[in-house]
Regions:
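N-terminal helical cap/lid subdomain that shapes the substrate entry/recognition surface
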Residues: 2-91, 95, 102-103, 114
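Structured helix-beta-strand junction loops
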Residues: 103-104, 136
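Proline-centered loop/turn at the N-terminus of a beta-strand
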Residues: 106-108, 189
Length: 210
């Protein structure tokens, strides 16, 4: 195994605990009656994917929600619906990420996400201690900013280039098997915890902290 120098973390289900049911309830409350068919824990589809891949703006998403629900929807309504996905932020995850950086590892975020979610994540409300998510990472590679979503190889290449890292010296931590498989095809080392599992106690992580 090559020496790890760069670590890329997924956001939902890895850095923060995710609630698909909470997200579904949020959009159902807003009036999207078929939210359960439209939403996913790993890769969005339809207009939700358009938002997370940067193909449409927040305003265009809001207008589509108005059309779907046949009523006036505000940007705040959209924000609150997306925020339903957030369960809680495990403090041990954040502490471990900081320890990895202190050990000299490059640490980045590689996430399928959208501007509504990032409004909360990159605000002082994120960790309960006044720090935005960007406080914890050297750099963030967000699908809506990159213009492409995992598992497309392009977003992995963007991350490797931005981190100036070789695939064999990179560890990718993600709870989505399809994302893990693509990373492996590109020669990236991987760790695949279950959704919301405590990965900080995994031997692969503990070894890096020694």
């Amino acid at each position: 195994m090559n020496e790890i120098k760069n670590i890329a973390f997924d956001l939902g289900g890895v850095v923060l605990a995710l609630s698909l049911e909470g997200g579904i309830r949020g959009f159902e409350k807003m009036g999207v009656s078929d939210a359960r068919q439209r939403l996913d824990a790993f890769v969005q589809k339809g207009v939700f994917a358009d938002l997370e891949s940067g193909r449409i703006s927040m305003e265009e998403f809001r207008l589509e929600m108005c059309r779907l629900t046949n009523k006036e929807i505000t940007l705040q309504d959209c924000y609150e619906a997306w925020h339903g996905y957030v369960d809680y932020v495990p403090q041990q995850n954040l502490a471990t990420i900081l320890r990895l950086r202190e050990k000299g590892f490059k640490v980045c975020l590689l996430s399928n996400t959208n501007p509504f979610m990032n409004m909360w994540a990159d605000s002082p409300e994120f960790d309960g201690q006044g720090h935005p998510i960007s406080y914890y990472f050297d750099k963030m590679y967000l699908s809506y900013e990159c213009g492409v979503m995992k598992p497309a190889p392009e977003i992995f290449h963007m991350m490797l280039e931005g981190q100036k890292a070789k695939p064999e010296e990179t560890l990718f931590v993600d709870d989505g098997e399809v994302n893990i498989k693509m990373a492996q095809q590109l020669g990236i080392q991987t760790l695949c915890p279950h959704n919301n599992e405590d990965w900080t106690i995994f031997p692969e992580i503990q070894k890096l902290l020694k």
